[in-house]
Every structure is written in C-alpha cells, then in structure tokens.
C-alpha cells in the first residue's frame, strides 16, 4: 500500500497544470501577460477517503511515512482502480490493436509526431485522438501528456499530435520507433510536497489530518 492506495480510494483529486505566468495592468488599463517556458509539471491535491480501519491500513501509514517528501512513486489513475478510469479513458476511435501499431517518429516543442503507416482498419476520417486524451511513450519513458485538439488519421504516414506541454527529452531514452500508451495506461512519477499526519479515532478508524499534495518529478 502506498500513494497509489490513497489515489485509488480518493474522495476527490484536484489537478493543477497552470503554466508559470504573470500578469500586470498598465495605467491605461491594458493587461500584459508574460509566461516562462517550462515543463509544466503535474500537481495533484488528493482528498483521502475517511473511514479506513486502522488495523487494515497500518502498512499504508508505514509506507507513507517511509516515502515522506523524499521518495518518488510511480502512480496511475484508472488502471489499478478501474473505477477511476473515467478520468483518463481514451476517447479516440482506435482499438487496442491499432494503438499498438502506432510508433513514435519524434517529439519536439508542443508536437508529438507519430508514425501511423502500419495502422490497419482506419480511414482518413478516423479520430485518432480527442482533446484531453492522455498519451505517453512506452517502455521506461516517464512523462505523460494530454492532447489539445482533435487529430484525424488523414492520408499521410505520420500524424502531428499537439500536446499540452513542451516535449521532454528523457536522457538515455530512444524516442524513434517507440510505442505509445494511452488512457488509463499512462503513469506519473510523483512525490509528496505536503504530507498530512494521521490519527486513530474511537472505533479503530484512521483519519488523515489534511489532503495529500503531490507534484510530478521531472529529472530531465
């Protein structure tokens, strides 16, 4: 049991993907906006479920204390607990076999270029991705993205997939030829930035004193 358990049993999960930006208002009333290019790490605030029996979750408290705000854990949303899959479900029109036929050509800036020349059973109007679909390179690639606009199959051998943040080149990872993961199969590497304490109340129930705040760790 671990952070994954907290997520799987969450009452709610709040997502923060805001870019680093500042606003100022001039004396003439004009709003000026300045943004800084960065990796836009995922941040999550997880409200833990009440009513856990302490005797059943002692190993969870031990693991949370071990992780502290030091160690990273790889987590998913909707794979370990299918009840959360509605958050991450893939909404494009490809089936699993077709997704497995897609390979990566390159990633650069805000675009992921995918090779679809081997994908069978599609037409030029097949919806490959819908806005909000989650996508990640397969294997040991660490960073997930969301698609920002609808992508059709078209007639070429590649498709350009617009993504929510600048593509992250992971050290030691070969992008060209890699497969992709979509939907509930993507993962995040997260660390606690705020770790609540816990207490045991009458009846033997476990209560957390606050929400868990998690941040994506970007090492590249």
Model-derived regions, located:
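Extracellular/virion structural assembly segments
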Residues: 1-220
